A protein has these predicted regions:
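Phosphate/nucleotide-binding beta-alpha loop and adjacent structural elements of enzyme active sites
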Residues: 1-228
């Protein structure tokens, strides 16, 4: 499909720009929530400074591809479940454009959602049952200080953060997607408040070339204090 090829091209440009910026900042751990096909993993593996990757992808087909690609890499730990507020069973809505698969509720009144369904032929064709755990539960015994947390879960970002209340303070950077459309029933203002309450400040925005969303990089101000 031509549209898919076009958006894959734009995505490559977008991911490359984030990777280039990441060369300027210091971190040792990469936490990739919504690993998809490894777009971030493949780039960030080039950073020798990163000691460990924790990667989460609940889509079973995509997870198998990640395992086949990275199973021999000792720097990478792969997890085949979603992250959210707490441990539970969830449904993942599978889109024919796999990067748009989501656990979030849709706003059926959204004009952008209607546009995607018609023009881009982006439809959630099926659902699968998946396991969900919380960030705090999975990573509580891991050393995640000085980490870069990337969250790209198509409208489910707030849920991920709500499950990280105890350990979010250890993340040095958080990269999170901000959709400009109202296709999901969520509010980015709640995400900003949660991050602000945890001493995170915005330092950089990366706009997708089509300008329908941006990735925002937040910095944990605790790391400005000595001996943290």
């Amino acid at each position: 499909m031509l549209i898919k090829v076009f958006f894959n091209f734009l995505s490559k440009f977008h991911y490359d720009s984030i990777f280039e910026y990441s060369k300027k900042i210091d971190f040792e751990i990469m936490i990739d929530v919504g690993s998809h096909q490894g777009e971030f993993i493949s780039r960030f593996l080039k950073h020798k400074k990163i000691k460990k990757f924790f990667c989460f992808e609940p889509n079973k087909k995509l997870f198998k591809k990640l395992v086949n690609r990275y199973k021999s890499n000792k720097r990478i730990s792969l997890f085949d479940y979603a992250l959210g507020e707490k441990s539970s069973k969830k449904k993942l809505y599978i889109s024919n454009l796999t990067y748009n698969s989501t656990m979030s509720s849709f706003n059926k009144k959204s004009n952008y959602l209607k546009f995607k369904n018609i023009i881009l032929k982006d439809k959630n064709q099926s659902t699968i049952n998946i396991n969900q755990k919380s960030f705090d539960e999975v990573l509580k015994k891991k050393d995640i200080k000085n980490s870069f947390l990337k969250i790209d879960v198509e409208g489910y970002e707030l849920n991920v953060l709500q499950g990280a209340k105890k350990n979010i303070k250890y993340a040095k950077y958080i990269l999170i997607e901000h959709q400009f459309s109202n296709q999901y029933q969520n509010s980015f203002s709640k995400i900003k408040k949660l991050l602000k309450d945890n001493n995170f400040v915005k330092i950089k925005s990366f706009y997708f070339p089509s300008f329908h969303y941006r990735d925002i990089l937040f910095f944990n101000n605790r790391y400005n204090k000595s001996n943290y």
